[in-house]
């Protein structure tokens, strides 16, 4: 909650929530609790917490009941297309084998194919590319290829100077936005 209350431009997402309703549910993550804690959305289907399509649908429906955004991860193009049919707000199509940095970023052909596949199902879904991003140039290249956002958790945390890497990636995002005008 403190992060959400003390930042102007940072949007807080929960990394998972269950679909239960207030009442019984020991050890479950209550959606209302997630929202009350300051999250505006929920991440679903990360490779470290995979979900079935029916479970994703239930989670998206619960998030919608609470006016929360949904950020979905997809491991393959086929999974990205299937998840797009559930209409989350954002899809991050990232092959799980390259998540965590050090193994290279998503190939540009995959980036472009995944954007196209998702937009063919639902043009309103924002596509974020993230797997394996380790520098600002990759952020710039992915945005110039059509990605609407870029993520880089391990690329930042594993950098020699994480603050400098954040600055580099933000500058690359700004440069791409300016170049696309």
Residue ranges and their predicted role:
Residues 8-63:
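Glycine/small-residue-rich loop that forms an oxyanion/phosphate-binding "nest" at active or ligand-binding sites
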Residues 12-15, 42-44, 70-72, 91-93, ...:
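Hydrophobic faces of well-ordered beta-strands that scaffold small-molecule active sites
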Residues 2-3, 29, 74-87, 132-150:
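Catalytic cores of alpha/beta
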Residues 15-27, 54, 72-77, 126-137:
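Glycine-rich beta-to-alpha transition loops that act as phosphate-gripper elements at the mouths
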Residues 59-63, 105-108, 155-181:
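C-terminal helical cap(s) of enzyme catalytic domains, especially alpha/beta-barrels
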Residues 6-13, 35-42, 86-92, 143-150:
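Glycine-enriched alpha-helix->loop->beta-strand junction motifs that scaffold or abut catalytic
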Residues 69, 73-122, 128-129, 133:
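Active-site rim beta-loop-alpha module in soluble metabolic enzymes
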Residues 40-51, 91-103, 145-166:
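Glycine-rich phosphate-binding active-site loops on the catalytic face of alpha/beta enzymes
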